[in-house]
Amino acid sequence: LAGSSAASDVYKRQFLGSLIVLAFQPFNYWLVTFLIPGLLYQLIKTEGIKNTFFISYFFGFGLWAFGIFWIENSITVYGGASPILGSFLTLLLAAFLSLFQAISFTAFKLVSSQRKTHEIFLLFPAAWVLSEWLREFLFTGFPWLYIGYTAVDNSLLQGYIPIPVSYTHLTLPTILLV
């Protein structure tokens, strides 16, 4: 990320991460789900470990900053905090949650460096599931923005897939389709 375009690169990664929010309710542009992970893969496939960490971190920051905007409202309206404090706390949470994407995709990069192409296409979805699993079970228990949720309300799968198993039964197949 060095050079004069470093700030521009950061914004591009954040923008890409924020676009995936469009796949969720209330927007429900679920086809975005098939485009954005593929673009993230294209961004990190030729990068080194350090750049992969930063690319996936800023991607995650865009995802979380736009995906959990409602928390700021909860903090200010129901918690009585100032809007500045509510915004700061929400961005702080987004910064923390972004670490899960960064760790998972950096692990993907470490594992995939000596793999064949068909193995990489299985490892990338596994890294996405790992980021959701780490967030859910090991650290925060924050069940928000599972990519598998985008498949629940689309016309193809509506009513067929239970929500409680979203990340295992929806996230992996969704990312595999990319």
Where are these regions (language model features)?
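Positively charged, low-complexity/disordered segments
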Residues: 1-7, 171-174, 178
